[in-house]
């Protein structure tokens, strides 16, 4: 994507993902690379199963608390994962995270 994109994410509906308790708002999708930026909203007890990041991943916790590979990340935490890294994401209390993916890997629909 080579042009500017501005979105009021509050105007987007939360869509149910294929995983129970996880909804999403897709902010950006690059049709050429498959890269995307997505908001994920986790209900208490939700789990995003183990998956690989072929192109890496950037993640920012907007609210709540998530456990990734045994480590807890709370509101305001940022995490970068290099290409080919593997993880799962769990929350006991609920959370909203911003995920930026340079390449497609896990189907977030």
Language-model region placement:
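A short, N-terminal "cap"/entry segment at the start of jelly-roll beta-barrel domains
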Residues: 1-34
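Ligand-binding loop in jelly-roll beta-barrel domains
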Residues: 22, 83-108
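Conserved hydrophobic/aromatic beta-strand scaffold that supports enzyme active sites
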Residues: 24-26, 37-39, 58, 78-80
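Short, charged/polar surface micro-motifs in flexible loops or helix N-caps
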Residues: 32-34, 44-46, 105
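Short histidine-centered beta-strand/loop micro-motifs
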Residues: 38-40, 49-53, 70-71, 89-91
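Glycine- and acidic-residue-biased ligand/ion/polar-headgroup-sensing regions
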Residues: 44, 53-68, 75
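Residue-level marker of beta-strand positions
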Residues: 47, 77-78, 96
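Short acidic-glycine-tyrosine-enriched beta hairpin
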Residues: 68-88
């Amino acid at each position: 994507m080579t042009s500017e994109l501005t979105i009021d994410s509050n105007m987007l509906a939360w869509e149910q993902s294929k995983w129970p308790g996880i909804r999403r708002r897709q902010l950006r999708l690059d049709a050429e690379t498959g890269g995307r930026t997505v908001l994920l909203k986790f209900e208490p007890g939700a789990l995003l199963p183990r998956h690989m990041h072929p192109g890496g991943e950037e993640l920012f916790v907007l609210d709540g608390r998530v456990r990734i590979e045994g480590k807890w990340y709370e509101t305001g935490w940022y995490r970068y994962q290099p290409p080919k890294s593997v993880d799962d994401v769990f929350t006991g209390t609920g959370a909203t995270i911003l995920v930026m993916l340079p390449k497609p890997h896990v189907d977030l629909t």
